[in-house]
A protein has these predicted regions:
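Active-site and channel-lining beta-strand-loop segments
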Residues: 228-230, 325-331, 339-343
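Short, surface-exposed coil-to-beta transition loops
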Residues: 209-211, 223-224, 320-325, 337, ...
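Non-transmembrane domains of secretory- and envelope-associated proteins
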Residues: 20-119, 233-234, 247-298, 306-307, ...
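Solvent-exposed N-terminal domain segments of exported/luminal and surface proteins
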Residues: 23-224
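Loop-centered beta-sheet repeat module
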Residues: 207-266
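Extended beta-strand-rich segments in extracellular/periplasmic secretory proteins, especially
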Residues: 95-98, 158, 166-191, 199-204, ...
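Bacterial N-terminal signal peptides
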Residues: 4-16
């Protein structure tokens, strides 16, 4: 009886307060985005956990893989083992910040307004002409924690799998703005509009050991990054003009290709191509990923089916390498799972395969889980070689000495 009365009262309230009912419905839709697998796991006919997909049965994955990747499974370049879909919920604080602030966020003439924290656009209308651009902003402000330290390596491998060059680094990143709890932002950085700072030190090989790079990224997408480089040989610091189209170390990864896409949003025209279930590299259950296939280019840890949004990005101006790129963005975490890039003639040139650490696994201290990258394979099929970026240790959300993230710090930490 009490339950019937309560339902009647709530029904009356919803009738007289339609705004409240709409807000609750929006909240449920947002939570469904952050927890998409609680109502069941995605399925594609013929694909089941434990199966192996290779050149003998590649057709089974035709609905879940882009043709640009499927053709190399068909050719026998690599094979895929399938695992069950992994639920990877983000931090509760990030989800709560999304619910608290999303309603006021606006996209006006390519600029984000009234953004505070969390996911800027948790509700994507597929018919919205700005849907693709909104997903790009979601990717930019995905949950990456407050601080993170990586100890990665990068190898340039040729068609035979021979490593032509290998580098090792220490990377530390601090996000000074848009933390889930506003009180935890860095006031001085926020006053200057500094979103994040990235410190990188080269550990090997010996000819470049001790070189340092400090990158300052601003919250405004139209404000270019500032870069300072410390040269260990001259013990001098130079300020460089940011070039997102530069490939470090002569590899197959432009600066803007990192994590699938880390370039300037305003330099591209964005188009939403739709949602789908895709077969993608799954989060690994080991400290480091396994490699194999042609050239030792491909991550061999199991792949899995996940809900993704597919977005196309075309340069609004001239680009030295690409005419367009496709991003396959994870619905739950807003990370890019893989990306495809096309040359100026429109031919498929590069594939970027991103592998992430699984919750409760991975090297180092991760604290509350955020999707840290374990590896990125950047494969150039025209040049027949690949850059393999791999993380060997991660320490997340621990206090860092901010002196390191300054020009003075480059001198202090210089050899």
């Amino acid at each position: 009886m009490y339950g019937k009365v309560l339902c009647g009262v709530l029904g009356s309230l919803l009738w007289v307060m339609p705004g409240w009912g709409q807000a609750e419905a929006e909240k449920e839709r947002i939570l469904a985005r952050f927890y998409p697998y609680r109502q069941g796991l995605p399925q594609v006919a013929g694909i089941t956990p434990g199966m192996r997909i290779d050149h003998t049965n590649y057709q089974v994955a035709a609905a879940a893989l882009p043709a640009e990747i499927l053709q190399y499974v068909q050719a026998g370049d690599f094979a895929i083992t399938v695992q069950e879909t992994t639920d990877m919920p983000l931090r509760e604080a990030y989800i709560r910040a999304t619910l608290d602030h999303f309603a006021r966020v606006e996209l006006h003439d390519g600029e984000l307004r009234h953004y505070v924290a969390g996911l800027p656009f948790p509700l994507i209308d597929p018919h919205d002409p700005k849907a693709g651009e909104k997903i790009a902003w979601n990717h930019r402000y995905r949950d990456r924690g407050e601080t993170v330290q990586y100890w990665p390596s990068n190898e340039l491998r040729n068609r035979d799998g021979v490593v032509e060059r290998a580098d090792r680094f220490y990377i530390a990143i601090v996000f000074g703005m848009h933390r889930p709890a506003e009180a935890h932002n860095l006031p001085q950085w926020a006053a200057q509009g500094v979103y994040s700072k990235n410190y990188m030190r080269t550990l090997a090989p010996s000819d470049v050991e001790g070189n340092q790079v400090l990158t300052c990224s601003y919250d405004r997408d139209t404000s270019p990054d500032e870069l300072w480089v410390y040269d260990v040989k001259t013990r001098r610091i130079r300020k460089l003009v940011d070039n997102p189209y530069q490939a470090g170390g002569g590899g197959e990864l432009l600066m803007e290709d990192r994590s699938g896409f880390s370039g300037y949003i305003h330099l591209y025209e964005w188009r939403y191509l739709g949602a789908q279930v895709a077969l993608v590299p799954g989060p690994i259950r080991t400290a480091t990923p396994s490699w194999g296939g042609r050239g030792n280019w491909y991550p061999l840890d199991p792949w899995e089916l996940r809900y993704v949004d597919v977005v196309e990005a075309r340069p609004t101006g001239s680009h030295p390498v690409y005419s367009r790129r496709l991003l396959y963005v994870d619905r739950q975490t807003s990370v890019t799972l893989y990306a495809l890039a096309y040359d100026l003639a429109g031919n498929h040139k590069r594939t970027f395969l991103n592998v992430y650490l699984r919750p409760a696994f991975g090297p180092g201290r991760q604290g509350e889980w955020v999707p840290h990258i374990a590896a990125q394979a950047s494969i150039d099929y025209q040049r027949e070689r690949a850059s393999i970026f791999q993380t060997h240790r991660v320490v997340a959300n621990e206090p860092l000495n901010l002196n390191r993230f300054s020009i003075v710090g480059l001198m202090l930490y210089g050899k």
